[in-house]
Amino acid sequence: MEQSEKTLDMIVNLCKNRGYVFPGSEIYGGLANSWDYGPLGVEFKNNVKKAWLKKFVQESPYNVGLDAAIIMNPQTWITTGHVAGFSDPLLDCRACKARHRADKLIGDEHPEVNVDAMSFDEMDAFIAEHEDIVCPVCGKHDFTPIRKFNLMFKTAIGVTEDSSSTCYLRPETAQGIFVNFANIQRTTRRKLPFGVCQVGKAFRNEITPGNFTFRTREFEQMECEFFCKPGTDLEWFAYWKDYCENWLLSLGIKKEHLRLRDHEPAELAFYSRATTDIEYAFPFTDWGELWGIADRTNYDLTRHQEASGKSLEYFDSETNEHYIPYVIEPSLGCDRVALAFLCEAYDEEHLTDSKGKEDIRTVLHLHPALAPYKCAVLPLSKKLGEKAMEIRNELSKYFMVDYDDTGSIGKRYRREDEIGTPYCITVDFDTVGDEAKGITADNCVTVRDRDTMEQVRMPISELKSYIES
């Protein structure tokens, strides 16, 4: 069986044509890099979030959950430095007026350069010295000096719009956890180490979003802030790196498509003791960041304690000490990892039938836990619809089930393969029997496996346990 080399265009086309992802506001011409998750996409993305929460909250003995507000007291973002310093390096092409991120221009032309370690002045000098760095729009090498572009979306609370009503859409979910540290520790009576996990929307006014859902201005994060005793942080840092990678592997990402990249000292945020990115080999780039795992020390809690005047210290009853915990942060983009799962699962298989005829089967080899539908019920004839719908209605009490009675059974199989449905259940005349023809009902159905295309006959009563196994 031969396989085609996958491209981002293939995946985007499947998503648009099969209801995974649509362009946002499409009837009005769309909105740059805005995407809506369709009927299949919302089930798929919800399954990604459920799988993450199951692993990081339900199965973890350390973690609890939180759902903090998107709009926070603006002092939060002043304290963290986001208002003053959360910015990208913006420059303009003098020739065509197009705006670009300076770090992206450098990185695209000189991938060997560690752009993250460069200051704005160093980027300016590098671009001036390298005439091969040109405007992607017009091809000219004529840029303005770099200036800061703040990434936060500003809004106003209340009926008046002045400086006193200014608020921001959160650029990250982490701060909602930090400001609730004392509340969570008090109400759960947790002892260190423990973590707080959150899934939620964040917003960044990116200069150059792109590559489908990889980088967007509105996105969803799945973050854990893990609080531990100072001095144990590097041990927990290693623990969470392994934990995160193993979660990806357990859901079908191949190990050779992942790499762990440690940040060099010059790349680290000034408060960070260590940071490692888990990167994925996307089809549109060599490596793209999926997960950032950082040792943030006690920086965030210390800053919030100083600014608010409220104690965020932890009392260690074993050592009789008060201290501010260190924090390990595994931060994952939900949209980004969902795209990685789609890229990993997508396949175009070149098949040859018994007569030598060639065909291409498009299939999403999604892990069953992530697939929008766990199975599809397909009556061989519309006359069998009543029994087929009865089976569908029973199974749908436990998981999402598709129902399709249109077209040949072969075409229906292919449609389900393309959207990633792990099993197809075919209801035939042997299932219900036919007294006139002397056929006794066997109350069995044929179950086809998406990945192997093999079929087995089994009693209807065993379907639920088989699909859930």
Predicted regions and their residues:
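NTP/phosphate- and nucleic-acid-binding module
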Residues: M1-S469
